[in-house]
């Protein structure tokens, strides 16, 4: 360790003290040095004086990079027949996120989802003639800390181009940064919940009139408790869905059917205040604390950040009656368009608004 005096100036001594590095006094250092080098029976003495200078939490080396291919088809995941836009089944954005998370969990045994950051829908996957023969997940570890957590950048792509062309180009569909941890933090409380039942609208109304295009397996909204310009509160419960129906996208530690209700909530709000349909674009951050089990009664609170005729950005919180969180989403954003109303099968472009009274 550093000795006081000599090259350790008063300024350098203060710097060591700020960093909790012990400076050895001349008297103590001289005494220990003399005792050690003059003691019998030590051919090669090694003397350590002072506190440990090991810096905790140093990033580990050897970041992994790998690719995984998957063929996707509707026959193996028939649940998406209940997620049609127009006539075509579409992979829900949150199921794409769950797909990337699931691959990380399989490749990193012992780790669990903590968060997804900067999730983007670049080109959604449709189960029609545009469905690629194969999809590639590219994973790149970008940070790892002493086995406590690892951050993985994930991208989903496919090859596009003419069959006769000499080279096909990658087409990117989704991207995010997944944080995997060995110990998920305790679920915090969402302390700004509004459980007032001022509107009391059955969720079935929105599924039946085409505000929401989702079929029975995705119909988890039981009631709209309240709705206003600043947000809304929903009462929810997920239907039972077999593993066989979910197929290649079977939910494990992160239930995408629960998270999908967040985007359904945004759709209800978009119709109420803009008379438009909406589709997911991105989420700044999703934090996951515990899973929502089927038939569990839970609530979804939405707080609007900003909205316009073309976009809606909001924070969404899935929680129990006391406010204890399951999942929260910061900066979720959807694109708005009145042309989506027809695709969603909206039956009456004024009825939905009139049913929600201020």
Which residues does each PLM region occupy?
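Flexible glycine/proline-rich, aromatic-decorated loop/lid segments
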Residues: 1-13
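Conserved thiamine diphosphate
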Residues: 10-27
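Acyl-thioester-processing domains in fatty-acid/polyketide/NRPS systems
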Residues: 23-358
